Amino acid sequence: MNIRFDGRTVIVTGAAHGFGRAIALAFARLGAKVHACDILAEELAETLRLCGDAATAHTLDVRDRDAVQRLVAEIVGRDGAVDVLVNNAGGVCGQVGRPIEDISPSDWQVIFDVNLSGAFYMAQAVAPGMKAQGRGRIVNISSGAGLGISLTGIQAYASAKAGQIGLTRQLAHELGPWGITVNNVAPGFVRSNPTTERQWDAMGPEGQKRVLDGIALKRLGAPDDIANAVLFFASDAAGWISGQVLSVDGGK
């Protein structure tokens, strides 16, 4: 299978490190014009350096609907309609697992804002252009927590990622008549960024062994494993696949 994205315009959110950086690099290597977006400007600059001339960096908070609309309008004005959107921005926002009675409304809401509302705002912004050209690919990055439970016990994270999977399925049916596919990649635990490194260390040797014992392949994955799944969903080879969730977790 020869996958290329020459001449295609791709937006990747959460591109400053981890999955997002790997996804942006993968698209850049395959000929795409990549718009790498993140709120972390310093780390985003490193992604841009690695991607080279194939990428443009944009400091963006996906929770800000107006900023999202402005950025997509700018990209469309420069490159034409967006061909591929990868909603990767997300995370636990610095939180750790705590009892439900200790969770404040703001603790709950901030995780929903970045993991679910951000994906909604981005899809909402690119949809008109994709409809106009009669094609498009939206790939949302959720988590195994959205299909089962959160390893870290963060209620809002598991709930927001489950909600993102529901959004994926709903948008697949809504946007399908315009040739737009919407799919979801649900990663297992991957040591891909500072947060997951802290989580891994906090597990200790026994907890780490339990995680590995629960994986069929008995090893953790890498960011490139997630990027490869995204490339497939974004490619012409996946043109008759929509509304699907692909677990990339080494086997559970």
Question: How would you name each of these model-derived features?
Answer:
Residues 120-123, 135, 219-248:
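C-terminal substrate-recognition "lid" of short-chain dehydrogenase/reductases
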Residues 2-3, 92, 96-97, 230-231, ...:
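Short C-terminal tail/terminal secondary-structure segment
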Residues 96-100, 104-109, 211:
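Substrate-binding pocket helix/loop in short-chain dehydrogenase/reductase
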Residues 176, 181, 186, 241-243:
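Short, small/polar-rich loop/turn modules that mediate ligand/substrate recognition or access, typified
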Residues 128, 147, 173-174, 239:
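Alpha-helical segment proximal to the catalytic Tyr-Lys
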Residues 143:
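Residue(s) in the substrate-gating loop at a strand-loop-helix junction
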Residues 123, 160, 168:
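Active-site helix of classical SDR
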